[in-house]
From Swiss-Prot:
Its EC number is 2.7.4.22. Pathway: Pyrimidine metabolism; CTP biosynthesis via de novo pathway; UDP from UMP (UMPK route): step 1/1. It catalyses: UMP + ATP = UDP + ADP. Keywords: ATP-binding, Cytoplasm, Kinase, Nucleotide-binding, Pyrimidine biosynthesis, Transferase. UMP binds at residues 68, 88, 149-156. One of its GO terms (biological process) is 'de novo' CTP biosynthetic process. InterPro entries: AceGlu_kinase-like_sf, Asp/Glu/Uridylate_kinase, Uridylate_kinase, Uridylate_kinase_bac. This is Uridylate kinase. It is an enzyme of class 2 (transferase). Its main location: cytoplasm. It is found in: Cytoplasm. GO terms for molecular function: ATP binding; UMP kinase activity.
Length: 252
């Protein structure tokens, strides 16, 4: 049942709390990587890389899925007349560009990073092999999953849910440019409330604009929690991993 303004974490300061999770899947929206424009905003990518590096140094295993919305959005291109399958593949290539950019910034932070793609691109990334991804994580490396599922009609939100389940992550950390899940769009409804806890079923039934229903159904069916939080607040990834009271926790 949804709970406006209730605690779901310890609330201690970052650095004082032992991480609540040992392996997480971080889902990043591609639009944020562009800073609201087409292309990459190096300042945003650096902010994200620095936050991930902080978490990895604390001993948490981090895998990442990135969208490609700062380059292409298949559904929107389809609305303008482009064939959906082709436009989806273009979007997958955009996610690989974002993945390589994040890899570069993470390695500048001293974090060993591997990119695995669902479409074979041997010169720039490894193929997606779940057991190899787990081995990388166990060695303290960040693994970034690019090219979505490698299939049209599947979003990167669904990719994040599937990859999280396959690598044995304990939670999907869904990073947004808003503080969490609201009862309505806060930009349109001044009475919209931030929900600190809600179930997967409620999100789906109420049509709350968080992620696509396929991703939430997959997480609901397999008991995978999702934490929706604001990525653009510095230190929020570490707070999320520590179980602090931020964002919205979605559980079964």
């Amino acid at each position: 049942m949804s709970e406006p303004n209730s605690d779901h974490g310890a609330g201690a300061a970052v650095g004082e709390t032992r991480p609540l999770y040992s392996r997480v899947l971080l889902k990043l929206g591609g639009e944020m990587f562009g800073g609201g424009a087409v292309g990459l905003d190096p300042d945003v990518v650096h902010l994200v890389a620095r936050q991930i590096a902080e978490v990895v140094r604390s001993g948490v295993q981090v895998a990442v899925v990135i969208g490609g919305g700062n380059f292409f959005r298949g559904a929107q291109l389809q609305q303008r007349g482009m064939e959906r399958t082709r436009s989806d593949y273009m979007g997958m290539l955009g996610t690989v560009m974002n993945s390589l950019a994040l890899q570069d910034f993470l390695e500048k932070e001293g974090i060993d990073t591997r990119v695995q793609t669902a479409i074979t691109m041997g010169q720039v990334a490894e193929p997606y092999i779940p057991l190899r991804a787990v081995r990388h994580l166990e060695k303290g490396r960040v693994v970034i999953f690019g090219a979505g599922m490698g299939l049209p009609y599947f979003s990167t939100d669904t990719t994040a849910a599937q990859r999280a389940l396959e690598i044995g992550a304990e939670v999907v950390l869904m990073a947004k440019a808003v503080d969490g899940v609201y009862t309505a769009d806060p930009r349109k409804d001044p009475d919209a409330q931030l929900l600190t806890a809600i179930t997967h079923r409620e999100v789906i039934d109420r049509g709350l604009a968080v992620a696509d229903a396929t991703a939430f159904s997959l997480c609901m069916d397999n008991g995978m929690p999702i934490l929706v939080f604001n990525l653009l607040v510095d230190g929020n990834i570490a707070r999320a991993v520590a179980g602090e009271k931020i964002g919205t926790l979605v559980t079964t």
